[in-house]
């Protein structure tokens, strides 16, 4: 089966928690069909996490061929370089290496990548157009995602609505010959550029030094925000012990993803 996706690399503000910590220079892959909606939701919620802003996960079955129309809306060359899939290195590598043709994409242009998948599981992709490891690079700002390859004959649905989906980090996977299971994409992102609500670098209340933010699926719940509210008596003024900052009874669920399932559900975390 041939599966076709139109994917766009876009700049976007990424809000990582309800405290307003955010990356003003975020970059993500999105399906073209969701681009306008995502931009509108982010514009309307500048200091609140938006559910649709997450690492892009697309799916296919073992044996499928995938055609990606990739469009670049960032101000430098970008690409989609996939791991573990089969492809022609001269046309679909998403890189500019040696004497091979440049298969990264200039700003405002597009390219067709063609992949074939024969192995079930995780096929990570990321940008190799801008490989800088600093904040001038793209990967640290969120330009990564994955193709999840399912058993032959599978289909996937939204875990809340039960409707078919074209993308999403979380999904329910069904197969006529195998038990259904819940699937969760879990992406670690080390030291994304994150500012606080005021646009300043976050400060650790213990060390009084700038603090990095480690995120999961573009979300983070750093101790610094909760601890400061407790120290200032804004939250739980009668509570004792700093360990209260870990407690969801006080603060509610964290903004990092919650993996929801019923007792006995088969699950896979990729």
Show where each model-derived region lies:
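N-terminal, post-signal-peptide metal-ligating segments of extracellular/periplasmic oxidoreductases
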Residues: 1-104, 184, 196-268
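Interdomain boundary/hinge segments at the C-termini of tandem beta-sandwich modules
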Residues: 9, 147-151, 188
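Short alpha-helical segments and helix-capping/turn motifs at coil-helix boundaries
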Residues: 52-54, 65, 110, 129-134, ...
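Extracellular/periplasmic metallocenter environments
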Residues: 74-81, 85-89, 94-158
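Active-site-proximal structural scaffolding
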Residues: 120, 140, 179, 262-264
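Compositionally biased low-complexity segments at domain edges in trafficked proteins
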Residues: 157-197
